[in-house]
Regions:
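A substrate-binding/cap region within the structured catalytic cores of diverse enzymes
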Residues: 7, 11-32, 41-43, 49, ...
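Alpha-helix boundary/N-cap detector
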Residues: 28, 32-39, 65-68, 105, ...
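Aromatic- and acid-rich polysaccharide-binding/catalytic face
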Residues: 9-27, 73-101, 161-167
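Surface-exposed, active-site-proximal loop segments in enzymatic domains
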Residues: 1, 24-30, 173-175
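Substrate-binding cleft of secreted/luminal carbohydrate-active enzymes
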Residues: 85-98, 120-202
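Acidic (Asp/Glu)-rich catalytic clusters
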Residues: 2-12, 41-49, 74-82, 108-118, ...
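Distinct, well-ordered alpha-helical segments
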Residues: 2-3, 63-78, 99-111, 135-145
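Aromatic-lined carbohydrate-recognition surfaces of secreted/lumenal glycan-active proteins
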Residues: 1, 16-19, 44-71, 84-93, ...
């Protein structure tokens, strides 16, 4: 497998996530997909001991049921002798800002539930509008996300900044001059903003 080949080349895989395993399907197929995810996570755990394994999911973002699928997933993995470490929520900030199917309060509800299952919670930080518009718009949208957490002094265990849109159009350099916003610059400024807001959180 590709994972085994990576290990043979000396690559250490610290994190591995199943992408949209239970959300990129019709609602009536979610239960069967959860069962498949349970098998996959258990199998991955055997091949990657020491690797933190989890799920990237968008069911809350789509306004679909998520609590029972998450509970079923975690219980199934543990019952099968495997381990699951995190759930990362795929939720562009535009979706949360709109408040239609998901909101920032809903995201915090998901976070609390994931913690109640004994897992770490992560938020994928991206902007659909910004990613389709410009590097600068993506930067500004993503940099506004920490403000949603500063006032109540809480934040997810993991923030994951990514884009599958045309913007940012470049990844480097992180020290790009004023008016340029490659992905690494956005990530660095985001991390600094978090460090200033939460100095005791590593």
């Amino acid at each position: 497998s590709r994972i085994q080949k990576m290990s043979e080349y000396g690559v250490t895989v610290s994190y591995a996530a199943l992408q949209s395993e239970i959300s990129k399907c019709p609602p009536e197929e979610v239960s069967a997909r959860v069962d498949q995810a349970i098998r996959d996570i258990i199998e991955f755990g055997k091949k990657m001991p020491g690797t933190k394994i989890g799920l990237i999911d968008a069911n809350p973002t789509k306004g679909r049921p998520w609590q029972e699928p998450y509970r079923h997933l975690v219980q199934g993995v543990r019952a099968g002798g495997g381990h699951i470490d995190f759930i990362h929520l795929d939720c562009p900030c535009d979706a949360a800002n709109s408040g239609r199917r998901v909101s920032w309060e809903k995201i915090k509800e998901v976070e609390r539930f994931v913690h109640s299952l004994g897992l770490h919670f992560g938020l994928i930080c991206t902007s659909a509008d910004g990613g389709k518009t410009s590097d600068e718009r993506f930067y500004k949208d993503v940099m506004a996300i920490p403000e949603r957490y500063v006032k109540d002094r809480t934040c997810p265990d993991h923030f994951i900044i990514m884009s599958w849109y045309p913007h940012p159009s470049r990844s480097l350099p992180e020290n790009a001059p004023e008016g340029q916003y490659p992905m690494t610059k956005t990530s660095l400024h985001f991390a600094r903003k978090l460090a200033n807001a939460f100095p005791n959180k590593s």
